Amino acid sequence: MKRSTLADRYCSIARSSSELMDAWSFVILRELFLANMRFDGLQAQTGMSPRSLTLRLADLAESGIIKRVAYQQSPARYEYRLTSKGKELWPVVIALKQWGDKWSGPWSDDQPPLTLHHKDHDHQLELGFICKTCGEPVDAHSTEGTMSPAMTAEREQTASDYQQAIRSKRQGGA
């Protein structure tokens, strides 16, 4: 399925993936969360070519995840700041970091590359999911999803279209 098609699906995972599913986007977000907001700093830390970085920054700005803010007039220079929409990606980025700490090592000094500390507390931070209603920890095994009627209808149509394509291919190939 094409990435542009994902943006049209009636699914929040598909739509958000169409905006973000690019490894470079997450590396840029990491840098912005680390307060590295200027083009030169982003290029230095990501290793991206100027053209690739420019394109990714434009995509993130078009999606409303970042905004470009002038910090110098002559010559014009900009920094890139997370919008409210972008700041709400923090738990997503940290969940990806924690997954990478566990599954993308081993690390040369037996420590993850970045540790987070809870400000004003004397401990490392580890992201977890807590139900806001009851306060209990939750995971994939303690939750279940309920699809909306619109999502159910789209999935049924997608399955039907797929089966029709298979039948057509078989009939044409016979």
What are these language model-derived features?
Residues 1-8:
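N-terminal intrinsically disordered/low-complexity leader segments
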Residues 11-48, 167-172:
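N-terminal helix-turn-helix DNA-binding core of bacterial DNA-binding proteins
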Residues 26, 63, 92-104:
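Alpha-helical linker/hinge and terminal dimerization helices associated
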